[in-house]
Amino acid sequence: MLNRGYAYTTIISGKDNGQTLLSHLASLYSHSTAQAWQQRLNDGEVALNGVTASGSEPVFAGQSLVWNRPPWIEPESPRHFEVLFEDPHLLAVNKPSGMPTLPGGGFMENTLLRLVQKQTPNANPVHRLGRGTSGIVLFAKTTEAAAKLSANWNTPRIQKIYRALAQGIARHDAYEILTPIGLVPHPLIGSVWAANPSGKPSKSLAKVISRTTSTQHLR
């Protein structure tokens, strides 16, 4: 799918004062080399304070930086979702596996956010699920709902339950998993959150729901 392109807008912070624009771009968007950024600058894709930039300009706090990325072909992904619940404040949808929740990693229009907002422009996700995960995503339709959900999201009032099909034979019926979670390299999208010894502390409780000869269904 060829999208319509996108204007990535940021404001220069004080810690970046005096850098050349080219150095700042290569640091801010590290997925591309300085050489690639210079080509984009030469093509007129970057503006600093509304003026097309060359890359040699020094940057200063408070300046507006815009990268007008031309249209690009997005990776394929599912484009259908199921509405599970809706009222004036909340929207709950079932996200299929393979669909990103938010733009990123080459995805812009082929995301749950864009598809939901085509039907409900005032809906904004309260949380996200990874691209490979299917399940319920909650959207707030009002600022009041967003504030209340965000305030309660990391409290015992909100419980997250995941189900997974795991390979191998589990010796026990219940597990406590304390493996730290952090960013690890990914060959296609740069990095993903996964088991990482230097990551943040995490705690998951897993219970075997059913078994086969080579797998188990966990919750």
Where are the regions a protein language model picked out?
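RNA pseudouridine synthases
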Residues: 1-219
